[in-house]
């Protein structure tokens, strides 16, 4: 979308002051710990781009607050590279750079904000190559330290800590399907047919590049088969998000030109787990 179209969408430039005012009206406040997802084009013409958005968020949450984003790794080996011909695998293993929390780019599919935030002075990024998060603020280290190698969306993950800290989730123009926190609900849900993946990626151990095997829910293709519950072409998290809003959970407002939502992290996880267990059927043990 060209500049004029964006300017018309937002009725002029969206400034740091305007964003901070709109975020405050939505309910974000001083001391909040918030994971945010942003679709920049939905916000309109943001004067200054990602730095303006981050600046406005920091203005609102203040020195006691913390910002968190999901990063991933843009150049991570694909899960299925171990199915390649052996010579191709060997070539990749020999020279593929190790994941480095400081140097490795955030997944471009997550938009511009994660990369902008993780580069900020004082930002901290978790150690997991496939499921890394970055945070900036008072609770940044507490959120990201010692990210579990296996089950990185489950207990003691940055997502679990966000919930435990009374954190929040902001969708700044991003669709409901962007609710990454629902992967934590998938990890916790006691429902049949849960799907897992095992994959290998290179990490740094005492300064040396080492290939390590990881185990996680299938966050790429879905931890469950939602096909009987979700219309074709629609993401399961979008449907869960709509049902959550219909139940009166979260706040909705306009930030810049963007339709935006603010949720309590615990509400998202509690609703997501209950939805999955009800719709997919609770797992039954022997004799259950």
UniProtKB/Swiss-Prot annotation:
Gene: aacC7
NCBIfam families membership: AAC_3
EC number(s) on file: 2.3.1.81
Natural source organism: Streptomyces paromomycinus
GO molecular function: aminoglycoside 3-N-acetyltransferase activity
One of the protein's GO biological processes: response to antibiotic
Keywords, comma-separated and alphabetical: Acyltransferase, Antibiotic resistance, Transferase
Name of the featured protein: Aminoglycoside N(3)-acetyltransferase VII
A Pfam match: Antibiotic_NAT
């Amino acid at each position: 979308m060209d500049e004029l179209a964006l300017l018309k969408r937002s009725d002029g430039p969206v400034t740091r002051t305007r964003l901070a005012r709109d975020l405050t009206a939505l309910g974000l406040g001083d001391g909040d710990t918030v994971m945010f997802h942003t679709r920049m084009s939905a916000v309109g013409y943001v004067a200054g781009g990602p730095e303006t958005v981050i600046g406005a968020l920091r203005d609102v949450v203040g020195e006691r607050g913390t910002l968190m984003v999901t990063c991933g790794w843009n150049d991570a080996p694909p899960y299925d590279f171990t199915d390649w011909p052996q010579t191709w695998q060997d070539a990749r293993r020999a020279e593929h750079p190790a994941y480095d929390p400081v140097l490795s780019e955030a997944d471009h599919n997550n938009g511009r904000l994660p990369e902008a935030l993780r580069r900020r002075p004082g930002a901290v990024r978790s150690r997991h190559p496939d499921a890394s998060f970055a945070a900036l603020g008072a609770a940044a280290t507490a959120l990201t330290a010692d990210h579990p190698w296996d089950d990185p969306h489950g207990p003691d993950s940055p997502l679990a800590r966000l919930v435990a800290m009374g954190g929040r989730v902001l969708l700044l123009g991003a669709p409901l399907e962007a609710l990454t926190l629902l992967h934590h609900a998938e990890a916790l849900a006691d429902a049949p047919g849960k799907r897992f993946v095992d994959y290998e990626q290179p990490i740094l151990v005492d300064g040396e590049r080492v290939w390590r095997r990881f185990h996680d829910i299938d966050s790429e293709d879905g931890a469950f088969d939602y096909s009987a519950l979700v219309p074709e072409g629609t993401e399961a998290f979008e449907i869960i998000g709509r049902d959550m809003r219909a139940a009166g959970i979260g706040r909705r407002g306009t930030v810049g030109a963007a339709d935006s939502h603010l949720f309590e992290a615990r509400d998202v996880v509690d609703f997501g787990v209950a939805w999955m267990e009800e719709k997919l059927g609770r797992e039954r043990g022997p004799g259950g």
